[in-house]
């Protein structure tokens, strides 16, 4: 029986539940398999443990959009703008601002 990458990441987290690199890797695996709810839960755990530079907030926002949760997506993009700007990623911050401009009603 082959062990999936998701199972491997889960095993790694069992010994170190706050390992931000493993949490991010697990979230990426959930993204690949369209496990959106699990991806959101894992990204929120990651963001609680890591000083993200903005990328995870964009992933989180897109996951919320996929579930039709625009308010949560907006909040994630806004936090992503702040993170990207504070870490010197103006292009990412501008991308998120552009997406949010489409949210204007």
What are the language-model segments listed below?
Residues 11-14, 44-48, 82:
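Conserved structural position within tetratricopeptide repeats
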Residues 70-89, 101:
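TPR/TPR-like (Sel1-like) alpha-helical repeat modules
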């Amino acid at each position: 029986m082959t062990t999936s990458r998701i199972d491997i990441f889960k095993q790694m987290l069992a010994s170190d539940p706050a390992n931000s690199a493993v949490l991010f890797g697990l979230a990426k695996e959930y993204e690949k398999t369209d496990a959106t709810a699990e991806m959101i839960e894992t990204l929120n755990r990651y963001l609680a443990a890591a000083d993200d530079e903005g990328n995870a907030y964009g992933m989180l926002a897109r996951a919320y959009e996929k579930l039709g949760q625009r308010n949560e997506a907006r909040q994630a993009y806004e936090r992503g703008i702040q993170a990207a700007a504070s870490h010197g990623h103006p292009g990412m911050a501008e991308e998120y601002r552009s997406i949010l401009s489409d949210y204007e009603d």
